[in-house]
């Protein structure tokens, strides 16, 4: 299969992966309305083409939390990467490191902190959930600090798991799930050989290290299901802020008031995110939520965004809507499942090229020049109502 665009990786991954794994990463909550809107709303953001601007000295470089990034992109936290490629977290981290951008290790990674951190030169970021087992949280933070992780991404939009109906149909959960997964695995030989056999162990490394015993997929589902904490409040985060002496980012913000609370709390950054449409179906897409949040806190806190970003044009759109940097999720996982480290490296090259084209044709020589003035209404379709204020005065 020829890979000429970032979107090609999704189709390639679907051919390689057992259905339970493909649909686990590809699916969302309930009827998947928000999952669809994440992509569709972002694609409806029209860019403003400008010409004859002498774009010979264009640069994608930016700085975030005193880290230099080759472009305003980081690989976001995605669980179970090691089920999609052999030691997947290590491969993805190496690709990000080579490209000069951060990699974020998920709490529920297959490869533990101690395996991933030494594999790269750049300090990685670490993502942590709010869990009932505070002992695990403290243990994970201590290990992340010891491994030299620079930034903590604290995910707060998961006090309870979302209802993901597609998982029951695909075999990730539901009746006879283990047998269904086995049958799917043996009928997908490329994955079975490369990952299923040679990618072992398939423990959840960070959890296994704490529990002191191997943890497989069933353990992962059961342990997490029993450990999400619906009682969490801002007050519960205070000990983490005191313990962690590096930048702390609150992930899962969709409302301007929550963004203001993050500023008052003393967070260094927020991620405007609906968990990729995997938690509460029917909430705003990140693209719709971002402008109002940027209007409320831009300049007071670093604004990151995820959910729906599939290519370099989407990165430019998110920045024009108010983000400082974006996180990739499914986009890099599709590439990882298709071709491992080389796939992620190629995806990042594609995104960089697409960003350069978009910036050249919108007259933005640097990331700081991508603003609301880079957006335009019209071209046969108005921007969604929640996005229109960002393009005020730019009607074509």
Swiss-Prot record:
Major localization class: membrane
Designated name of the protein: L-lactate dehydrogenase
Membrane topology note: Peripheral membrane protein
GO biological process per UniProt: aerobic respiration; lactate metabolic process
Compartments, as annotated in UniProt: Cell inner membrane
Active-site residue numbers: 275 (proton acceptor)
Role, per record: Catalyzes the conversion of L-lactate to pyruvate. Is coupled to the respiratory chain.
Disulfide bonds: none
Annotated ranges, domain FMN hydroxy acid dehydrogenase: 1-380
Top-level taxon of the source organism: Bacteria
Binding sites annotated in the UniProt record for FMN: 106, 127, 155, 251, 306-330
Species: Escherichia coli O6:H1 (strain CFT073 / ATCC 700928 / UPEC)
Binding residues for substrate: 24, 129, 164, 278
Gene this protein is translated from: lldD
Record InterPro entries: Aldolase_TIM (IPR013785), Alpha-hydoxy_acid_DH_FMN (IPR012133), FMN-dep_DH (IPR000262), FMN_HAD (IPR037396), FMN_hydac_DH_AS (IPR008259), LldD (IPR020920)
EC number: 1.1.-.-
Keyword tags: Cell inner membrane, Cell membrane, Flavoprotein, FMN, Membrane, Oxidoreductase
Recorded GO MF terms: FMN binding; L-lactate dehydrogenase activity
Similarity field: Belongs to the FMN-dependent alpha-hydroxy acid dehydrogenase family.
Catalyzed chemical reaction(s): (S)-lactate + A = pyruvate + AH2
Cofactor: FMN
GO cellular component: plasma membrane
Gene3D superfamilies cross-referenced by the UniProt entry: Aldolase class I
């Amino acid at each position: 299969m020829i890979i000429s665009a970032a979107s090609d990786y999704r189709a390639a991954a679907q051919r390689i992966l057992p259905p339970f794994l493909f649909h686990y990463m590809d699916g969302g909550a309930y009827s998947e309305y928000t999952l669809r809107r994440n992509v569709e709303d972002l694609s409806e953001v029209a860019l403003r083409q400008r010409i004859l601007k002498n774009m010979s000295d264009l640069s994608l470089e930016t700085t975030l939390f005193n880290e230099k990034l080759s472009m305003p992109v980081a690989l976001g936290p995605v669980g179970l990467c090691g089920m999609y490629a052999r030691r997947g977290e290590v491969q993805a981290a190496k690709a990000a490191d080579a490209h000069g951008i951060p990699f974020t290790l998920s709490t529920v990674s297959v490869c533990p902190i101690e395996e991933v951190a030494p594999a790269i030169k750049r300090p990685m970021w670490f993502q942590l959930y709010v869990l009932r087992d505070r002992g695990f949280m403290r243990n994970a933070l201590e290990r992340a600090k010891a491994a030299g992780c620079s930034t903590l991404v604290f995910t707060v939009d998961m006090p309870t798991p979302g209802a993901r109906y597609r998982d029951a149909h695909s075999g990730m959960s539901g009746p006879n799930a283990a047998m269904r997964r086995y049958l799917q695995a043996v009928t997908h030989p490329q994955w079975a050989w490369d990952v299923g056999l040679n990618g072992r162990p398939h423990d959840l490394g960070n959890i296994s290290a704490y529990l002191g015993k191997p943890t497989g997929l069933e353990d992962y589902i059961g342990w997490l299901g029993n450990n999400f904490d619906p009682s969490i409040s801002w007050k519960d985060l205070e000990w983490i802020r005191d313990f962690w002496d590096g930048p702390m980012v609150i992930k899962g913000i969709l409302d301007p008031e929550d963004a203001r609370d993050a500023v008052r709390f003393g967070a260094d950054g927020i991620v405007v995110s609906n968990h990729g449409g995997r938690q509460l179906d029917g909430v705003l897409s990140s693209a719709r939520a971002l402008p109002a949040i940027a209007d409320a806190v831009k300049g007071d806190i670093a604004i990151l965004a995820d959910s729906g970003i599939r290519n370099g044009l989407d990165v430019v759109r998110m920045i024009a809507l108010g983000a400082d940097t974006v996180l990739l999720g499914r986009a890099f996982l599709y590439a990882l499942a298709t071709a491992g480290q080389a796939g992620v490296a190629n995806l990042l090259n594609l995104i960089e090229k697409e960003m350069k084209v978009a910036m050249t044709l919108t007259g933005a020589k640097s990331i700081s020049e991508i603003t609301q003035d880079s957006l335009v209404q019209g071209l046969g379709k108005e921007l969604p109502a929640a996005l229109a204020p960002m393009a005020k005065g730019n009607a074509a």
